[in-house]
Amino acid sequence: MKYWKKLFFRRTKFFLVFVSLFFSFEFVFTSVAHENSESTANDITGGDFTLNSPDGPLSLQDLRGSVVLLFFGYTSCPNVCPISLATISNVLAEMSPAELEKTRTLFISLDPERDNLELLKKYTNYFHPNIVGLTDEISVLKKVAARYGIKYERSLKPESTLGYVISHSSDIIIVDPGGIVRKTFPHDTDTAPLLKELKLLLRVTTL
């Protein structure tokens, strides 16, 4: 009996280690699949754009006077996008009501085939009501993404229930109240430096 107990625990331990390693590898693989080379503010042309939101067309120009956070992704993104939006949500939670009034966050979906406006609204509201989901036709999205240094590519995954994934740059882009790109942060940035940058821009705005 003791022999079988030892054998059972050894096999169980091996199985748990194997499962842990498998999911660790899967997470790393998926993370790599959803990230490309990052951009810096100097690499970004930027500029105004108009995309569709759940409440109608929204232009970046309409947000003059506010600090804007831009993030490109898609709702089926398994890890990079949720991490980024959770970080942004934590930053927004640290702001005063007056600061929130002068801060806008735009989540631009690169997957218009799956991400309709109703789904985008539910997805962004899950993280924070200040986050607005935007999308449009693929041709329009490509132009906006290129101007903001976002590289992305759709890859078929027939073995996956999703059917395809989208590899994409994952910077959080900060646009100042004048519509100029000021800084970019990696998707896994800590809350503190992002919050510090936003507060700095907001203070400059109110001077």
Which residues make up each language-model segment?
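Bacterial N-terminal signal peptides
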Residues: 15-26
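N-terminal "domain-start" segment that seeds a small globular fold
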Residues: 32-62, 86
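Conserved helix-turn-beta segment immediately C-terminal to the redox Cys motif
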Residues: 66, 83-108
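Thiol-based oxidoreductase modules, predominantly thioredoxin-like and allied folds used
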Residues: 102-114, 130-139
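Short, internal strand/loop/helix patches
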Residues: 121-169
